[in-house]
Every structure is written in structure tokens, then in C-alpha cells.
């Protein structure tokens, strides 16, 4: 991973000399080191650094680095004693539910039902905690639904703290190595997701650095390796992996077509560098990757990777919140912005070569407000090239208005329940499931729904992760949670399905019900089992609320096939007679439709010099590219996989 480390120690020596001159002697500086994209200053007396409120800002300005001040590890109280003391300092009314320590950054995470009481008036209690235990406290509200995924991730980071710190220092030295070249050229190569949906992977190359944006798997094409995985056979990518030259991977969001192949790289030791993404994306992609290998096991298929490979992904992930600017290579600076697609989804902005070129890569995005999220960000400091999705880029790809979609959903549900049927809504565990939950929750609150809403698959765990990150949700939901004291995710109408026996009981029951189950495309997961048993009964309905990829069972049902062969777990093929009503309501998609895509181009600022359309069926990428050029006069391309485009 580490390349051309020459001069790093000399650079650090110069930085230390500047810091010693600017920082009060009583701070007791013990070490200065690059850790990941930050410059970390370790001190014996952190309080001395806080007396001058402008000190850190001035240091960052002079050094042109992101500065973090941490207590020297030697002054930290042992976690057991620190926890005991924190509980003595914080009033019991705060209702602390968990205290966890991250030795790699000297931080203690305090979860409490009333975080304001942990902070104290004007931050007095927080300062007292810092003085007494020396750990840097971070206070968060206790998630109303406990997430096993989040707990496991925190446990891994705590257990592996020594290796984690060593890793961060290696990353820091790689980022701040002395550049051997002044950036003169930039190009991108499509390794997957160009003129197709699935296996998204884009390689950004300069004469100094290599960065990969997304690395997904096409779950609809797993039987065909030539279509399922990114192009490992691309000469430049093979060279980068063989020589260990890849500086970083950036993940736009958690869905498997963007993150599903990450653990594979660690299984075969093809990469050991940093992965950058938002905290919710790290948690959600962990959940989805774990589910992916479980489903492969259940289907009798050798999984692409193992749980310990997912653990390696966690250990190598560096999280950024929206708007935080970080150096990730000597000539590349990264900022993540809200994409409005799913929890934690990001538009990637890359500032290359100190003003040479700026790229925004949208990933999957939504450009209108939804119940869960604010619209995608469309303003950037600088922008020359925009790489944008085209899932609904065709000239006729206009989705139903959101209000109309919600009305239609309620109508179909009401009609189905009235005739004693069950409603099956296949949904991705992350995104559409929670969006539909919010629609149904509001309708239930006014008495419109009186039957249980069953959540099957990973939906309950994914929802728990949503409740842990309210700051990433829409303003409306944040106001409900923080100001009105009401959390819509906790409505008792939602029932979690614990196992296959409960699932069968729901199917066998003669009572009407609403079932939201994974997967959204009927590719594995409990939604397939529900479909097989509910499809023959005309009283029932299936409602598709998200994109159905070519080659999936969902696409076959959506097209109106009435007899569908399905291979069972025993290897036998059974023909399913589809007599249930089939409905598609596009208005709930997390992807921008044609209207939103064109609107985004009209509103994005600064106006880009070039737009590249990706992540869509070939004719949709081409249609959108052509339309943008005709309407806005902007240079456009709709490249194929393996095409390389020089941007500068």
C-alpha cells in the first residue's frame, strides 16, 4: 500500500517544529503523526490546547492539514475505571445505556436517552469528564432500536484498536508522501456499471494516484461471471492491483451493486488500503454483505468471501460526514455530499491537483424531497466533470408524482385487504422499505390501516440502523423525533418476523396482512417464499416499488408472465401460477427519473464542462447523454465498460 515514502519523516519533522512554536508548552506535546487523512497531535494536557479557541484553526491554516488533538495514550484511565467515573459524574437522569471506548482515537462514546444531561449546562459535565478520565467524550442519543450490526462494528474497532492505529499511520504516510509528479493528466476507466445497472466500479487515475469509486456485484447475473463482477481483466486495473498502487476506495452507498465486492479484495489480498464512506454506509454495507453470503450459503453456492473478510473491510474503513474535506492522496481531496438515495448515500466530489480538475460522481441519487431524505446536493465549490446515473434516463422514464404514488399505494392495499387478501411488497432492506414504512405509518395513525404490517428479512435491522443516524434523515422526521418526541419507526403496527416458522404462519393465516420483505427484485430472501405461496391466490396483490433489473424474477413478474418456473432449494423446478394482482408504482424509487435528471443538470453549479452518463441500460445512457447535449450544449459521453476517458 505504501509507495514512495521518501521525505515523509522530514515533512513531519518540519511540522513538529512549527507546532512546538505555536502550541503552549504546558500542553505537553508527546507525538505528532499522520493518521489517515488527519494530522494528529498527542498531548499530556488536552485542556491547555482548548484555552485558545483559535489555536487549532490557526494550526490548520498554517499547515494546510486537518488537525486532530488527542490525549496521549499513557494518560488515559483504564476503560473500566473511566466508565465507573463517568457514571459518577453524569446524573442518573441522563439514563446512560452504553459506554464504549475506541483506543485507536482516544475516544469514549457515551450513549444516553437524554444526551443533554451528559453534556451539562454550557458543556460543564463534558469538560469535567475530559479532565477526570482524559478520554475525549462523544455523546449520542441512544438508538430506540438496538442494532446488532452497530454493536459488532464498535466491538471490532475496539478490539482491533492497535492494528487500526498502525493502519491509520500507514495511510497517513501514503497520503502525505512527497509527490513525484505534478498532476498533468486525469482519466477515468469504467470497470462496471457503464451502459448497464449493476457491478458499479470506476477507476480514477492521475500521473500520481489511483482511486476507485464503488466496487459492486450484479446479483442478478451471478451465474455469468462475465456480467456479475467488475472487470478485473482491465489491464490498468490488473496492474494497479498487482503492484499495490491503489490509494483508496470510495463507496457512494451501501447497496450491493456498489459495495458488494469489497470483501473479495481482502479475501485474496488484492488491497489493504483505506475505504472512505459515511458512517451509515459502513454499517449498512456490513449488514448487506453479511446477508449476501448467508443467502449464497442457503442456495448451496460457495460464497465469494467470508465473514472475516467483511471484518477486514470494517477495519479499513474511514468514515466521513457530509461536507468534511479530506486529503486521500497527494493530489486528490475528497468531499462527500448528500445524494438523497438511501441512508448515508453520497455524491463524491474529487478536487484534483490543487485546482487542476474537479469531478462529481453522483452514484445513485434523488433530486426531490422524500419522506426519508432531503434532495441531492447540486452546488459544489468547483466542477468540471459530472458523472451521473441514468437508471431512469430514457425519454419516457417519468415516475408518478410522489403524492399520486402514495395515494395509489393506499388504494391497492385497501382494495386487497377489503377482499381478504394479503399484500406483498418486495423491497430492498435499505431505502425503499423504510420509505414505504413511513407512508403506511402515517396512514395507520389516522386509522386507515388496522392490520399488522410484517417486516421480514433484514428490514428490522436496517431500520434499527436508520434510528441510530437521525441527523441523516429528512428535516420532517428529525423534527418528529427531537421536537415532538415521536419516532414513527416505533409504531406498534410494525411486526418483525423472527424466523421461517413465523413466516409460514403468516402465509397460512386466513387474515389479511401487509408484508414488506427482502429482496426487492425477488432474487433470494423471504420475498421469494412469500411470492411462491401467495401468487396463485387472486385475492392477493404484489406491489413493486423499486427498479427491477433485467434477468430477475421481479422483472418477469412485472412483465406479466403468468407461469414462471422457479428452482427450489432441493434443485427441482416448479412452475408458479401467478394469479395475484401485479402492480408497479414507480413513484417510490430512490433514483431520479428523467425529469429530475434533466432538472439536476439545469441546476447544478458550477455548470460542468462535461457530463458522462452511467448506471443505466445502454439505450437510457445514450438517450440521456444526447438529450443533455441538445438542450444544454454541454459535451456528453455514454461510455461502455472498459472505455477510458481522458478528462485533462
UniProtKB/Swiss-Prot annotation:
Residues that hold Zn(2+) 1 according to the record: 253, 255, 341, 364
Sites where the protein binds Zn(2+) 2: 257-258, 364, 615
The record's free-text note on cofactor binding: Binds 2 Zn(2+) ions, which are required for nuclease activity.
InterPro entries linked to this entry: aCPSF1 (IPR019975), Beta_Casp (IPR022712), KH_dom (IPR004087), KH_dom-like_a/b (IPR015946), KH_sf_prok-type (IPR009019), MBL (IPR050698), Metallo-B-lactamas (IPR001279), RibonucZ/Hydroxyglut_hydro (IPR036866)
Region named KHa: 9-76
A single GO molecular function term of this UniProt record: RNA endonuclease activity
Similarity comment: Belongs to the metallo-beta-lactamase superfamily. RNA-metabolizing metallo-beta-lactamase-like family. FttA subfamily.
Name of the protein this chain belongs to: Transcription termination factor FttA
